[in-house]
Amino acid sequence: FMITKEHKIKKYCLFYASDFHLEMILLPYIKKNIYKEKFLIFTQENLSESMEILLNRTNLDSDEKNMMLNLNWDGKENLEEKDLNNYTIIINGNNEYISEINDKINKINPDKINIIDCYSINDKNIEPQRIKEKYDDILNTSGYKKM
């Protein structure tokens, strides 16, 4: 008999109105999972500054703050050299950018991965109703909802 690799890819989508709103949605998810998952962040906009401001306003302990600040919020990551298993990959940008990063991930073909695609509702090309159909769950400030 053949042993097949089990692929567990969970795809979440997230819709936000501003960088702070995006970070407010991501923060609880990251806080909950930062000790058991590795995170990679791909973003067209550098989020380092706004994330630092936000984290300084939270009541997280300094270890958690530092762990979160040490994530690469400027979005400059190289996918090719990474073993993506057990990663959560956060992708923030326009449709083309999100598709491009997802294509690169699919080529690497990891066994177990979470992908969170983040869409700005201010982008006129974003159609939340149509986009949501492609995802397992939607992430919002109260956690994630089953679709």
Identify the function of each model-found stretch.
Residues 1-147:
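Non-catalytic regulatory/interaction regions at protein termini and inter-domain linkers
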